């Protein structure tokens, strides 16, 4: 769901940095 995506966002941001 959308909430799960929001929880994954921080992890994605870490991978981008």
Curated annotation (Swiss-Prot):
* Protein name (Swiss-Prot/TrEMBL): Antimicrobial peptide Xac-1
Whether rRNA-binding counts among this entry's keywords is: no
Its annotated function is as follows: Antimicrobial and mast cell degranulating peptide which probably acts by forming pores in membranes. Active against both Gram-negative and Gram-positive bacterial strains as well as against yeasts. Has leishmanicidal activity (IC(50)=25uM). Has little hemolytic activity. In the context of inflammation and cancer tests, is weakly cytotoxic to normal cells, induces calcium signaling but does not impact cAMP production. In addition, prevents LPS-induced nitric oxid (NO) synthesis but does not affect the IP3 signaling and pro-inflammatory activation of endothelial cells.
From the Swiss-Prot or TrEMBL record, state where the protein is found: Secreted; Target cell membrane
> Which family would the database say this protein is a member of?
Belongs to the xylopin-like family.
Principal location class: secreted
Q: In which tissues is it expressed?
A: Expressed by the venom gland.
* Positions carrying Histidine amide: 17
Provide this UniProt record's keywords sorted from A to Z. Answer: Amidation, Antibiotic, Antimicrobial, Fungicide, Membrane, Secreted, Target cell membrane, Target membrane
| Keyword match Nucleotide-binding | no
GO biological process, alphabetically ordered: defense response to fungus; defense response to Gram-negative bacterium; defense response to Gram-positive bacterium; killing of cells of another organism
Specify the superkingdom: Eukaryota
| Entry's Gene Ontology cellular component terms | extracellular region; membrane; other organism cell membrane
The cysteines covalently paired via disulfide bonds are none
């Amino acid at each position: 769901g959308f909430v799960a995506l929001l929880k994954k966002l921080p992890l994605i941001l870490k991978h981008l940095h």
